[in-house]
């Protein structure tokens, strides 16, 4: 059954994505936020399919912690699920991502129109300056900013290196940081075709005032909170 559900989801994804990419391209004349609301409908459709085809549901703990003003989300990264679900759970957001993702046919074209902060990871300090410049603009435009400090998907029970770029951005922009932990990787593995039914738990921490931190201390505080929650969400056997 899991195989058939996963196959049906993949087929639906293949059928839905190209026509939605055309819809996304048609949003080009719209204001950024209006454009985002239309394009993020694809992610909402994928989460609907995940629930009704794959049997993957989710619950959110700590939604009351979301500040009223745009913030920087620093989250655990385990699968593609959270990149979709966050567009349902959180206010309109942009992602800090590697620019190569924008080169993917259909998916990348639509992604480019959501106003992401696309950086060249190999350009070092120039990438940080670019991230800060675009970050301030996006926050002023009413967007939240979502970043995975580990930089890549990490298997449940494992921990990657927490890079300080997201904390550095928050400190430089004076934006609050919202730490997020989840266990999506237990059901939707990294690069896995098979996706298992169940309920993903997403935990949202209290916002952290970046203005009272250095990038290093903020990064450490985020890591401590996330990994503390992960011990319960993804206990090591």
Residue ranges and their predicted role:
Residues 62-66:
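Glycine-rich helix-loop-beta junction characteristic of Rossmann-like nucleotide cofactor-binding loops
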Residues 1-11, 34-38, 103:
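Structural motif marking the loop-to-transmembrane transition
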Residues 4-29:
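A hydrophobic membrane-anchoring feature enriched in long, contiguous, low-charge segments
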Residues 60, 73, 95-96, 202-204:
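Generic preference for hydrophobic
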Residues 3-4, 128-237:
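Non-catalytic C-terminal accessory region of glycerolipid acyltransferases
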Residues 61, 96-98, 119-121, 149, ...:
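Thr-Gly-centered strand-to-loop micro-motif
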Residues 20-41, 51-53, 68-124:
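Catalytic core of membrane glycerolipid acyltransferases/transacylases, capturing the structured
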């Amino acid at each position: 059954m899991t195989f058939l559900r996963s196959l049906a989801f993949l087929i639906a994804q293949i059928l839905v994505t190209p026509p939605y990419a055309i819809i996304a391209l048609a949003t080009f004349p719209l204001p950024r936020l209006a454009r985002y609301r239309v394009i993020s409908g694809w992610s909402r459709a994928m989460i609907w399919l995940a629930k009704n085809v794959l049997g993957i549901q989710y619950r959110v703990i700590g939604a009351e912690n979301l500040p009223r003003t745009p913030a920087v989300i620093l989250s655990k990264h385990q699968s593609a699920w959270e990149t979709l679900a966050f567009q349902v759970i959180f206010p309109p957001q942009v992602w800090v991502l590697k620019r190569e993702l924008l080169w993917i046919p259909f998916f990348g074209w639509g992604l480019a129109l959501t106003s992401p902060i696309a950086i060249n990871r190999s350009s070092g300090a120039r990438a940080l300056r670019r991230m800060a410049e675009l970050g301030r603009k996006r926050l002023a435009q009413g967007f939240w900013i979502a970043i995975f400090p580990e930089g890549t998907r990490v298997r449940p029970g494992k921990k990657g290196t927490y890079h300080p770029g997201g904390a550095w951005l928050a400190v430089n922009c004076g934006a609050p940081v919202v730490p997020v932990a989840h266990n999506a990787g237990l059901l939707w593995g990294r690069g896995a075709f098979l996706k298992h039914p169940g309920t993903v738990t997403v935990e949202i921490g209290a916002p952290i005032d970046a203005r009272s931190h250095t990038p290093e201390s903020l990064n450490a505080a985020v890591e401590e909170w996330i990994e503390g929650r992960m011990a319960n969400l993804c206990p090591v056997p």
